[in-house]
Amino acid sequence: DVALPGRGHGFALHPDHTHAVALARRPGTFATAFDLDGDAPGLTFHAPEGRHFQGHAVFDPAGRYLFATENDYDNERGCIGVYDRADGYKRVGELPSHGIGAHELILMPGGKTFAIANGGILTHPDMGRAKLNLDTMAPNLAYVDMASGRLEDSVSYPEGRLRKLSIRHLAAFNDGRVVFACQDQGQTTDGLTLVGLHRPGSGKIEDLEAPEATTMSLVGYCGSVAVDPAGTLAAVSAPRGNRVLFWDTESRKLT
């Protein structure tokens, strides 16, 4: 096993499947890199002053650079820290996430664009895990060029009650469709649909619906997302509802 300095959240798996990085839960600042054979001690590095990790990262296709979601809390924006594995995970740059509260990011098919779940929630480490902008939060799903940081596309819920759905986790099919899961920051008894499907360039979110009783049982909270290689099924965990749900994304119906 590998000891961590504190509570972790997510992992980034190296493309060769021999190495990984565990990242701190927000507002933690540590990340620990380790080999999966367990023969060498882990290497812990930290986010710079003025930043903290958001629990998720991904390697570039070549496996040299690690891209980690961070909170630039004094400037109230999300960013992506760039860390060089070849130089002991030295931080060598950053990209904008084009939103607030960047959480999970994934590398899209083709290996050149990130999909980023900007949860829309402003936090500051001096306030612990307090959510500071629930009245004005504006989550989005952003597609960002890995090389330049340019925003290629984005989609968000319309103004109003749906803006309280914080986009947190996501996964992409090989054809580029993205499934994402939300956590409701409003009245969870409203029973809003928590899982969406987006086709880049479409400009719209397609709901992956469930029967009302099932939706209510999720208590406004969905977690991780996974998709099958065949391009049909999406799985979403619901920790507060003690279940995992499966959707057929062609029919957009729960299986």
Residue ranges and their predicted role:
Residues P15-H17, D60-A62, M108-G111, F173-D175, ...:
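Residue-level detector of Asp-centered blade-edge/turn motifs that repeat once per structural unit
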Residues T69-D72, I116-A138, F180-T193:
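Short, conserved, GDST-rich strand-edge loop motifs in beta-rich repeat architectures
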Residues V2-E70:
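Blade-loop segments of beta-propeller domains
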Residues G6-H14, R51-V58, I100-I106, L162-H169, ...:
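Repeated scaffold domains used in trafficking and secretory/extracellular systems
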Residues C79-D87, K131-G149, L192-G203:
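Beta-propeller blade signature
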Residues V2-G6, F45-G50, E94-G99, V155-L162, ...:
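Surface loop/turn motifs at the tips and blade-to-blade linkers of beta-strand repeat domains
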Residues P41-P109, G120-H124:
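Asp-box/WD-like beta-propeller blade repeats and closely related beta-sheet repeat scaffolds
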